[in-house]
Amino acid sequence: MLAEKGKRVIVVSRSKPNLGIPGLEEKIADASSLESLLTVASSAKTIYNCANPPYNTWEVEWPKISSSVSEFAMRTGADLVICSNLYGYGPHQGVMTEDFPLKATWTNGVARAKVWQENKALNDAGKLRVTEVRGSDYICANEQSRMGDRVVPNLIAGKPIQLLGSIDQPHTWTDPDDVAKLMIALAEDDRSWGRPWHVPSNEPKTQREVVADIAKELGVTDYKVAPVGLLLENILGLFNPVIRELNRGRYQFTKPYVVSSKAAQETFGLSPKPWNQVITDLVKNYKTDSEKNG
C-alpha cells in the first residue's frame, strides 16, 4: 500500500522474504540489533514495527526487538508505528476499548504490554513519536490464522475441522488489510501519537459461524466442525510449544471476545473491509494454490 502511494519502502527481515512486490526494497537484518538496522537504513521517516518472532519466544525476543527498533527510530528521527494485538489486556469483562488497563499475567500478554508501556514512556518524554495498532485474531491465509490453514484446506478436501477453544462464543476477527490501512493512516495524522488504536473490524462471529461462511463461499454443504476439547488441548500443549502458549491465552475463546474499533473509525474515517469480501479474499488464496497443485 505504501509503495502504491509512491513511497520508498524498505522491508527488513531476518531472511529475504521475496515478496516480489514492485517498489519494495527487501533487505536482510536482525531487528534485535541496532547496528544491523543501521546498516540497511541510515535514515527513515516512519518505522512500522510488524515483527513477529516465534510465538513461544516472545518473552525473550520482544524486549530485544522493541528496544532496538525504538533506539533506531530515535537515532534516525523517525516516527514509530507498532503493530500489536489485544493480549496485553489479559482476561476482561465487556467489550474491549483502548481505555482498558494492560493487566495480562501470561508471558506473551506481559511481553506485548511491556512493549507499549516502554514506548509510551518515550513518547511522553518527548524522545519519540509512537502509536500502536491493536488487532484481534487475523483471518487470512496462513498457518497461524485460526481460520486459515486449519480450516480452508480441510473444507476443500472434505476433512473434518477441529478448533481450539469454544466454537460458539462471539469473537472479533481482524483482516490484515485493515491493519495496514490503519497503520498508514496513523503515520500521516498527528492525532494518532501517544496512544493505541483498535483496528477497524467487523461485527463478532463465532468460530462455527466463520467456518459456515467459508464453506458457503467454497460451495461446500457437507462438513464437520468440532472443538478439540480441553483434555486434548492440554495433551497437545505438552508436545507443541506454540499450542502450549495458545492454551495460556485460552480465555480468548472460552467467552465473548469482542472489540470496539469505534475510536479509529470515527477519528480517521475508516471502516473494515466488508465481511463477504474478507471471506472471498481468504478463499481465493487457497483456490489459487489448489488450482496450481491440481
Residue ranges: model-predicted function:
Residues 14-75:
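NAD(P)H-binding glycine-rich loop region in Rossmannoid oxidoreductase-like domains
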Residues 143-150, 164-187, 194-198:
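Substrate-positioning beta->alpha
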Residues 142, 170-177, 199-217, 226-234, ...:
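Substrate-binding strand-loop-helix patch
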Residues 59, 265, 273-294:
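Amphipathic terminal alpha-helices
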Residues 56, 86-96, 138-145:
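Conserved catalytic-site region of short-chain dehydrogenase/reductase
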Residues 212-258, 291-292:
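Terminal hydrophobic/aromatic helix or amphipathic segment near a protein terminus
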Residues 85, 118-142:
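Conserved beta-loop-beta element that borders a ligand/cofactor-binding pocket
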Residues 10, 67-114, 123, 131:
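Conserved Rossmann-fold NAD(P)-dependent oxidoreductase catalytic core, especially the SDR/UDP-sugar
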